[in-house]
């Protein structure tokens, strides 16, 4: 497999494995993926240009890669707390946590959530309007940001 490319593998109805398909790209990070609706999913990766790029599956076909911007490093993480909502988090070149979100009809601009991370973030949604993001801080501590549907809180 060529370095810096994305691949997918799927099973046919009989359970037999098929070959990996290249989805292209110039990946510099591990991809992150989330689903925001039935038969819909979106994959994200930081490319060699330092920007986040995404590509989505609509249930029938993969759409082309789309640049989402940012000045990022490391590996992104993504989650969804409801239909037509996607949240993506990544560590910026400044060490801060950066957030990008989609909903309901368009991508919103990147926002810095601050902090100084020394690891890639991990995010999870445990209900509608609920997201928790974790990362390692400068002193080896666990940083935590939580969204309650209205505001971010930090611990």
Regions found by a protein language model. Name each.
Residues 1-155:
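A structural motif
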């Amino acid at each position: 497999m060529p370095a810096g490319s994305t691949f997918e593998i799927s099973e046919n109805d009989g359970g037999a494995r098929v070959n990996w398909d290249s989805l292209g790209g110039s990946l510099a990070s591990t991809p992150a993926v989330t689903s925001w609706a039935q038969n819909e999913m979106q994959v994200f990766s930081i490319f060699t240009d330092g920007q986040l790029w995404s590509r989505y599956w609509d249930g029938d076909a993969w759409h082309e890669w789309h640049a989402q911007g940012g000045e990022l490093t490391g590996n992104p993480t993504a989650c969804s707390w409801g239909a037509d909502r996607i949240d993506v988090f990544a560590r910026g070149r400044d060490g801060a946590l950066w957030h990008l979100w989609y909903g309901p009809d368009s991508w919103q601009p990147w926002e810095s959530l601050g902090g100084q991370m020394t690891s890639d973030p991990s995010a999870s949604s445990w209900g509608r309007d609920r997201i928790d993001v974790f990362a390692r801080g400068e002193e080896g501590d666990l940083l935590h940001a939580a969204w309650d549907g209205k505001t971010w809180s930090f611990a």
